[in-house]
Each structure stands twice: as structure tokens, then as C-alpha cells.
Amino acid sequence: MASLKKSLFLVLLLGFVSVSICEEEKRQEDEDEHEEEGESQEEGSEEKRGLLSVLGSVAKHVLPHVVPVIAEHLG
């Protein structure tokens, strides 16, 4: 009976250890995925900021010349 208890205890202990290792690996994979998602979102926001600054610069230089021409044709 004592050897059965020891064997059962050993099986349970090894089971808990393997479950703990699997949970740790899964947690690490989830953290890696979140970091990758964050990096891709940061790259997307940088692209948007770059595009908006280019559009703003173009509008700043082109609109003063275009608005009077449009006003002439409409008026």
C-alpha cells in the first residue's frame, strides 16, 4: 500500500511539473505574439503620421495657388 501511495504521489508530481512547464511556455508565446502585434501597430501608426505630414506639406504649398484659380472660374 505504501509503494502504491509513493507511485501515485510521483505520478501526480510529474504531472503537475509538466503542466506547469506547458503553461509557462504558452504564456511566453502569448507575450511574444502581443509584442509582435504592438510592433506592427507602431509601424502602421508611423506610416500614417508620415503620410499625413506629406499631405499637410503638399496642401500648405499647393492650396494658396489653387484657391484663387478656382475662385476665378467660379466667380
UniProtKB/Swiss-Prot annotation:
Primary location:
secreted
Q: What is the name attached to this protein's record?
A: Caerin-1.1
Report the superkingdom from the record. Eukaryota
Q: Which is one Gene Ontology cellular component term of this protein? A: extracellular region
Please describe the post-translational modifications of this protein.
The major product is Caerin-1.1; in addition, different peptides are produced that are missing some amino acid residues at the N-terminus or C-terminus. Caerin-1.1.1 and Caerin-1.1.4 are inactive.
Copy the domain comment: Contains two amphipathic alpha helix regions separated by a region of less-defined helicity and greater flexibility.
The record's Pfam families line, in alphabetical order, gives: Caerin_1, FSAP_sig_propep
Which UniProt keywords are present, listed alphabetically? Amidation, Amphibian defense peptide, Antibiotic, Antimicrobial, Antiviral defense, Cleavage on pair of basic residues, Immunity, Innate immunity, Secreted, Signal
Give residue ranges for the propeptide: 23-49
